[in-house]
Curated annotation (Swiss-Prot):
Record protein name field: Uncharacterized protein MG459 homolog
GO biological process: terpenoid biosynthetic process
Ranges that cross the membrane: none
InterPro entries, A to Z: MECDP_synthase, MECDP_synthase_sf
Length: 169
């Protein structure tokens, strides 16, 4: 048996949400009552910190490179079609398809740092469901903690994964 550990971290600046039309995604779930939006270029609006951190950790654990290649059409082996915004909900599913032949996910530990004004309790179950479906794992495999960030103008996610190489039959 070969076990490997991966670490992924994603951090973005956020700002108060001024208009209802802006979407705020965390863990594959649109946070409809969000008090924030990402404070960066709209072309990078597919920035779901949980998905990107977990994907990065999985790519690192399996020695397949940087999880950021998911958004880079020039370097990726996971081709994107069209607008990256529409691809965001499939980041984890695409990552899983890339690693599933050789690796089994034992567990994922996620720490989400988001200002306390944004209540996440109502969304935790939906985030668990999304991650479990995308990665074909059970809820017992995931641990999700939410805490206050040091900088109230940032959202960040730290993900640690443990994977096991699958034996060839």
């Amino acid at each position: 048996m070969q076990f490997r550990v991966g670490l992924g971290k994603k951090k973005y600046r956020i700002k108060p949400r001024a208009e209802q039309k802006n979407k705020f995604w965390i863990g594959g779930v649109e946070i409809e009552d969000s008090k924030y939006i990402y404070d960066h270029d709209a072309s990078d609006d597919a920035s779901d910190v949980i998905q990107l951190a977990v994907a990065d950790a999985l790519f690192g654990a399996t020695a397949l490179g940087d999880g950021q290649i998911v958004f880079n059409k020039e370097k990726t082996q996971i081709p994107l079609k069209g607008n990256p915004r529409k691809e965001a909900p499939r980041i984890l599913a695409r990552t899983y398809n890339f690693i599933r032949k050789n690796w089994y996910i034992n567990n994922i530990d996620i720490t989400l740092e988001i200002p306390s004004q944004q209540k996440m309790d109502d969304y935790k179950h939906a985030i668990f469901d999304f991650i479990c479906t995308a990665l074909r794992i059970t809820e017992l495999t995931i641990n999700l903690k939410v805490r206050e960030p040091l900088n109230p103008n940032e959202i960040s996610c730290l993900a640690v994964v443990l994977v096991e190489r699958q034996r060839l039959k």
